[in-house]
């Protein structure tokens, strides 16, 4: 009898998730024709979910910048979605950055994700931080600016407190939104959110959600992003190296559970790192009630 009651409670618990959430999606510029087809298939598949915006990542060199610019403009023109380019302060002068920002504004782009960017080896120029970039963008036009946060601390930060102060500096410079690095330890995120509030950051801390379809790739990414991979996640993917179908099912389950838990903790907005693949993200959103 008690078992039946537990099952009934579990079923009700699953059915009770009817909170409306907002989603946004990240894509990256394709490097060949096949990847470009995949990108546009993904964009068109996910646009029907009416995301708040979609972002497009960015490399420091001019070729990458041009690709990002072209894709963002095309998304805006062809789909009507709010498209946000990533912009970094690496390998461009302040005047060049101002011109890039003006070009975006003139193209109808109103949202930008402002980042410092990764400094290449031997980089000797004076640092141009994300807070500097936010301030520069504010001087050009009234952009809607998102910045990055690191619940498990940026790998180059001297301390967790120094990293938090740096985030506050970006907010004080004029950033409107905060998007986190992907993570899997929800307690860490919640503690980080509390610490943000304690120093006066009242902007919503939007969690970055990465559905993990390639665990080995995740391990490589985690090694240089300072993201901790919990033991339960290692166990979940154990033995699945040659089983992509099951990996996708695990990825969907983990992502859905994370969103449900975070939603009950008051989180309303979620940013999905799609890796230019729509099927899994679409399925996750569908199960969370985000539908056309």
Swiss-Prot record:
Top enzyme class: oxidoreductase
UniProt name for this protein: 5,10-methylenetetrahydrofolate reductase
Residues annotated as binding FAD: 58, 60, 86, 116-118, 130, 150, 154, 157, 163, 166, 169-170
Chain residues that bind (6S)-5-methyl-5,6,7,8-tetrahydrofolate: 118, 181, 217, 277
Catalytic activity, reaction form: (6S)-5-methyl-5,6,7,8-tetrahydrofolate + NAD(+) = (6R)-5,10-methylene-5,6,7,8-tetrahydrofolate + NADH + H(+)
Active-site feature positions: 26
GO molecular function: FAD binding; methylenetetrahydrofolate reductase (NAD(P)H) activity; methylenetetrahydrofolate reductase (NADH) activity
Annotated NADH binding sites: 57, 181
Family (UniProt): Belongs to the methylenetetrahydrofolate reductase family.
Cofactor(s) listed in the protein's UniProt record: FAD
Amino-acid biosynthesis found in the keyword field: yes
Keyword presence, Repeat: no
One biological process term in Gene Ontology: methionine biosynthetic process
Metabolic or biological pathway: One-carbon metabolism; tetrahydrofolate interconversion; Amino-acid biosynthesis; L-methionine biosynthesis via de novo pathway
Function: Catalyzes the NADH-dependent reduction of 5,10-methylenetetrahydrofolate to 5-methyltetrahydrofolate. Is required to provide the methyl group necessary for methionine synthetase to convert homocysteine to methionine; the methyl group is given by 5-methyltetrahydrofolate.
Enzyme Commission number(s) from the entry: 1.5.1.54
CDD domains recorded: MTHFR
Species for this entry: Haemophilus influenzae (strain ATCC 51907 / DSM 11121 / KW20 / Rd)
Pfam families, per database record: MTHFR (PF02219)
Keywords from the named record: Amino-acid biosynthesis, FAD, Flavoprotein, Methionine biosynthesis, NAD, Oxidoreductase
Name of the gene encoding the protein in the UniProt record: metF
GO CC field: cytosol
């Amino acid at each position: 009898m008690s078992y039946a009651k537990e099952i009934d409670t579990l079923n009700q618990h699953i059915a009770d998730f009817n909170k409306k959430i907002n989603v946004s999606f990240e894509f990256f510029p394709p490097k060949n024709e096949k990847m470009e087809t995949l990108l546009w298939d993904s964009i068109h598949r996910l646009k029907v979910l009416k995301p708040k915006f979609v972002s497009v990542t960015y490399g420091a060199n001019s070729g990458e910048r041009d690709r990002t610019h072209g894709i963002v403009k095309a998304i805006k023109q062809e789909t009507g979605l709010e498209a946000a380019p990533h912009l970094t302060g690496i390998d461009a002068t302040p005047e060049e950055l101002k011109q890039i920002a003006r070009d975006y504004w003139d193209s109808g782009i109103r949202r930008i994700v402002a980042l410092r960017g990764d400094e290449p080896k031997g980089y000797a120029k004076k640092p141009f931080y994300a807070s500097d970039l936010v301030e520069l963008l504010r001087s050009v036009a009234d952009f809607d600016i998102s910045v990055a946060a690191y619940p498990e601390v940026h790998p180059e930060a001297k301390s967790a407190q120094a990293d938090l102060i740096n985030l506050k500096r970006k907010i004080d410079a004029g950033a409107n939104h905060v998007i986190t690095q992907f993570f899997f330890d929800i307690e860490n995120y919640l503690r980080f959110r509390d610490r943000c509030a304690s120093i006066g950051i009242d902007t919503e801390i939007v969690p970055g959600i990465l559905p993990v379809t390639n665990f080995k790739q995740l391990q490589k990414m985690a090694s240089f992003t300072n993201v901790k991979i919990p033991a339960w996640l290692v166990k979940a993917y154990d033995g699945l190296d040659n089983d992509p179908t099951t990996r996708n099912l695990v990825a969907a389950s983990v992502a859905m559970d994370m969103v449900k838990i975070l939603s009950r903790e008051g989180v309303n907005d979620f940013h999905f790192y799609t890796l230019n693949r729509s099927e899994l993200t679409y399925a996750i959103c569908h199960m969370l009630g985000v539908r056309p």
